[in-house]
Amino acid sequence: MSLIPATTEMLFAMGAGDKLVGAGSYDRYPPEVERLPKVGALLDPNIEQILTLKPDLVVVYGTQAELKNRLERANIPYYTYVHKGLPDISETIRSLGARVGVATRANTLADSIESGVQRIRSRVATRPRPKTLLVFGRERGSLRNIDASGGVGFLHDMLEAAGGADVLSDVRRQSVTMTTEMVLARAPEVILELRYGPPDAGDADDLRQWNVLAAVPAVKRQRISQLRGEQFVVPGPRVVTAVEQMARTLHPEAFR
């Protein structure tokens, strides 16, 4: 059982999806996950339902202390998910694959991810690295509460692998809430915005909001792009696709 979108994807990708007896409420990929009972998520695990399903192993977040205590009392083993950066994806796949009895397939998957990311790194290695602001959230229709990737973590690692220079690389946090004044001071040459749902009528208006920061190089040169898909925020097997999408946006000439 997995309560975490990333590890649920990993288990399916390594060929262990048929072993799952339950999944997290926010687990949406692959489509086969929809057949599974939903047992809550980080803040609201349905502990009674989890125990009723009698899993042999539960993948949990490190902060789910109450759930882990109940699992221990029921003699149900758990695997604690830890994720800080890009290398943790392969490490988690290898260790989780060993726990569920598909080590060979898990190692093959991890090798494929590592080689895929390295292929993209090599492709953009000689290109100038534009100063990039990677935004993963803000208030719709405004430039308030701009949530951006800081200088550590999964998003930062993806951006660096894609050939961008994180404009917040000196801030040793995974995320930074920025004001427009901070964006002006950092002067990014490229702005990448991550979007998660289907396209809607507000997307174009959201892009236009940046025009008020005309002094920012990315705005002046119209180097602002929206990148869409959950693969950008779920640190799992689709990370190679996410890194390549970033790289193609930052360095289109490298993929011609």
Residue spans of the language-model regions?
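Short helices/loops that flank or line small-molecule/ion binding pockets
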Residues: 47-54, 73-74, 178-187
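A short, structured surface patch at a secondary-structure boundary
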Residues: 1-53, 57-67, 164-167, 195, ...
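A ligand-binding cleft/hinge motif common to bilobed small-molecule-binding domains
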Residues: 65-73, 190-209
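Acidic/histidine-enriched, beta-strand-rich ligand/metal-binding domains
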Residues: 172-174, 182, 190, 196-197, ...
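Short, structured coil segments at secondary-structure junctions
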Residues: 16, 35, 74-76, 162, ...
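His/Asp/Glu-enriched short active-site or ligand-binding loop at hydrolase and phosphoryl-transfer sites
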Residues: 24, 149-175, 195, 226
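Extracytoplasmic substrate-binding proteins
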Residues: 66-143, 165-170, 222-256
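Short, charged, surface-exposed secondary-structure boundary motifs
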Residues: 29-37, 49, 88-93, 204, ...
